[in-house]
Amino acid sequence: MKKTKILFPFLFSLLLVISGCSKDDDEVVDGTDDITGGEEPELPTPEDPEALDLSQYSSGQKVMMQTFYWDVEPRFEWWNNLSDKVEGWADAGIDRIWLPVATKGQSGGYSMGYDPSDYFDFGEYDQHGTVPTRFGTREELENLISKSHDLGLEVIADIVLNHNSGGGLEYNPYREKDTYTLFNEENGNASGMFNRNYEHFHPNDVSQSDEGDLFFSEQDVDHDVPYVQDWLWKNENSVAKYYKNEMGFDGWRFDYVKGFGTWVIEDWMNEVGGFAVGENFDGNADVLVDWVDATGVSAFDFAAFYKMEEAFDRFDDLNYLDGNTLRKVNPDKAVTFVANHDTEKDENEDNRIATENKMKAYAYILTHDGYPTIFYSDYENEAFNEEIKQLIEIHNSLAVGDVEVLHVDNDEYLMKREGNAENPGLILYISTESTTKRRNVQTNWNNVTLLDYSGNTTYTPTSDENGMVTIEAPANGYSIYSITK
């Protein structure tokens, strides 16, 4: 009996201990992590906080749309397809549209334009087996540009300056063989503008090669030749000035800029100006920074792209999001993106961001500094469309101020945009954990209820008098917090 009396209280106490341990083990929200130290605030939260009217706020910057993917369909109808979509894009907060290469390539009706043959055939000459380009006729393109301008959209031309393709065969004394370097009215240049021959490609009596990487070596355009400069950007009817003054293009996306010197971009821009971005396909941020400094124009931030791929896919480690990128060094010249026509068709999974991780990547680029680009196929994907539109609205309204990384580890990434006197800014919280996560963070907002403007969580905490608040991220997702009214 004495043993029983002693054992019963002991068992009761043990049950209490076990019960307490079970409660901790079942807790799916981690409220113990504390970025700034101190105790997690326990403040009342209103049941129905009133969201800000985001239309009353402006970040001062919008978003560009890449309007194509590789081998778009239907062929010959793409300009009309885009004309049907530009009004919706403008309403969503897009301010520029990047069109595919608009002129005739060697592959004719199948060409995506990166095998340029006739720089002035916008779909009006019968050559390479077709009158229209893959995308349609010149008239349809002009209608698209006109409609876009009426909606306040700038139109960006895709320009291939490095190489040509689709010319006729001629004897080339510099190579001592026949080469496909003859471009005239009968050979791939029906417009008769900017006829070319072997003297306009490397090697010739002006230069053996340029300072860029070699690509399409037999038809590698020699920009040192004065005739080439005249036709590409100097003459009043040059490619640059014709595209701007006759066709109405507002800016430029330069293809494969590794293939020629930075001075080519400088000379082009000195003649026609406008927004410009270069495709320098390199994940090394230092390479991108040097190129931007040399040319004075923007570059696609491939360094940021690969950091996102490493963070979300390859290494599953969000620390990579805080790595070195063009955006971190020169955000005003960084054009960020999640996918493009090249990455999406790449069979190497390390060169594309997995579909299941794309929305976290879009949340990243649409809350950070830099100029975001949306990929056509992602925006038009019904599974992504509404979410991307919401992120664009958040970007265009609240993505303001300096970027401060509040916390980063393998599974969590928290970033604050400081805002300014007229704009509260935001906090991004990305988590790849399998359960809901919470973090205690320091904000600029005192005694105010917060709301996740992405709509991914309904948790609405209130900050204390010092701006401390606990925010929440859903499992394997993100939230974007800012103040309420």
Task: Kindly label every feature range from the protein language model.
Residues 1, 14-54:
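Bacterial Sec-dependent N-terminal signal peptides
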Residues 1-8:
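Bacterial N-terminal signal peptides that target proteins for export
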Residues 35-66, 81-94, 101-103, 108-122, ...:
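Active-site-proximal helices and loops of the catalytic beta/alpha 8
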Residues 58-63, 105-146, 179-223:
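Aromatic- and acidic-residue-enriched carbohydrate-binding clefts of CAZyme catalytic domains
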Residues 168-192, 196, 265-279:
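A short alpha/beta connector and helix-capping loop motif
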